[in-house]
C-alpha cells in the first residue's frame, strides 16, 4: 500500500471529526446536583410533567426516566428500578469473559457484586396499581439468570436474591435497604449485602492465604440525605420532600490503638474493593466487608465513578501494578451497560500497564497547542494492525481528565475517540487503550494519531505518546457463547 502523505490527514480532517465520538460511560453522578430550595409543603403525588419521558432531557435526567410516586415519600424510576430485563449483548458477554480471563492470568479472582434493583428489594413500597404492573417474578428470575451468567464466565458471584422482596415491620426504626428518594443503598442495605458477599468470599481458596484481622463497627452519627430522585422531582414539579436522616457507621480494627497500624501487616491489603458511589464512605460498605470478612480491604471506589471509573484508575496505579490483590470485589448496578467497548479497551490495556516497560513501535513527546495536533505518524509504513497494538498517552498535567483523539488508518478510514474520566476522580493524566478490534477493525493498519489540544487561551499541554504491542492474556476456556444465550 502506498503511504498517505501526512498532509493528506489535514484534508481528511476537514470532515466533522467531532461527530461520532465514542464517549466513555458517564456513571450516575449522584452527588452533583444540589437540592433546590423550595418553600412548598412536602408532597404526596408527582405532577404530570414527571410522568412524561420527553421532559427528561439531559443525560443526567435520563437516568431517572420516569419517576413513579409510591407510598409516602418513596419514589421509583420505571426504567431502572422497575426493570425486568437483566442482560447484555453478545459483545458484552465476550468482553466480560476476556476481562475475567485477563484478571485470572494476573492471579486475581474477581468477585462481582451485582446489586438488586430498588424495585426488586423495596417493591412493597409501591402503590397497589404500580405494584400490580411490576412483574416481580419475571424481574427476579432474569436477575438470578444474570448472576448465573457471570458465574458461568468464572466470576465469583454472591447471590443477593435473598435481599429482594423486603418486608420490614412498620414498628421497627427505618432500616430500609434503599433510601426513599435516592438510588443509593442505606448503610443498613450495605451491611446486609456485605454479610452475603463475605460468606461467599470465605468459601474461596484464596481466602485461606489472606492475613486475618478483627474489626468492629460502631454508629458514628447521622446523615441527612436529600435524595437524587427527590431532587429530580423538584426540578420537574417544583415540589420538595423531607430530608431523610439515617445512621452512619465507621469500622475500625478491634482493640487496636490509632497508631497500631504502624506495627501491623495491614499496609498491603490483599483484597481490593472497586465500584460505584455505593462503595463510598457514607454507606460504609467497605467497613462492613472488613468486619464480616475479617481482613483488611483497600477501598478505591469514589463518588461519581460509575461502572469503570475506579477500576480504570486503580488498574493504572502502582498499588495494582506492584501488588495486585488476590481478590478484587467489583460492585456495580444493573443500570450500567456492559458492552461499552471503550471501557474494555482501557481496562485490557491497563491490566498489564499499557506500554510501560515495553518496546515502543512509535513514540513522541510534544507540547499540544489549541486545535488538532498530529502526535504520531507511521511514516515508515510499519505493521501496526489494530489486533496487535495499543496506545499509551500521558499528559504531564495529572488533572487532565479528557482525551479527544482521531486515529487515522492507511486506507483513509478513521476513528474518533473520546475518553472522559469522572470529575470526582484523582487522576494521573494517563489514557491507555487498545486499538479497536470490534466489527471489521482488527485488520486496520494505523497511519497516524491526532490529539485535540487545550482550549484557546489555555496553557499548552505537554504530552508523551507510545504505540506498543498489546498485552496477550491466555483464554480461560469458559463457555462464553452459552452465557449469552
UniProtKB/Swiss-Prot annotation:
CDD domains from the UniProt entry: AlgX_C, AlgX_N
Record-linked Pfam families: ALGX, CBM_26
Region (SGNH hydrolase-like domain): 30-355
Enzymatic class: transferase
Gene3D superfamilies (UniProt xref): C-terminal carbohydrate-binding module
GO cellular component: periplasmic space
Chief location category: periplasm
CBM domain: annotated segments: 356-482
Pathway per the UniProt entry: Glycan biosynthesis; alginate biosynthesis
Disulphide-bridged cysteine pairs: 47-237, 355-468
Record-linked InterPro entries: ALGX/ALGJ_SGNH-like, AlgX_C, AlgX_C_sf, AlgX_N
Compartments (UniProt record): Periplasm
Active-site residues from the entry: 182, 184, 277
Record's function text: Plays two roles in the biosynthesis of the exopolysaccharide alginate: protects alginate from degradation as the polymer traverses the periplasm, and also plays a role in its O-acetylation. Probably has acetyltransferase activity in vivo.
Annotated domain remarks: Consists of two domains, with an N-terminal domain with structural homology to members of the SGNH (GDSL) hydrolase superfamily and a C-terminal carbohydrate-binding module (CBM) that may bind alginate.
Protein name (database record): Alginate biosynthesis protein AlgX
Name of the encoding gene: algX
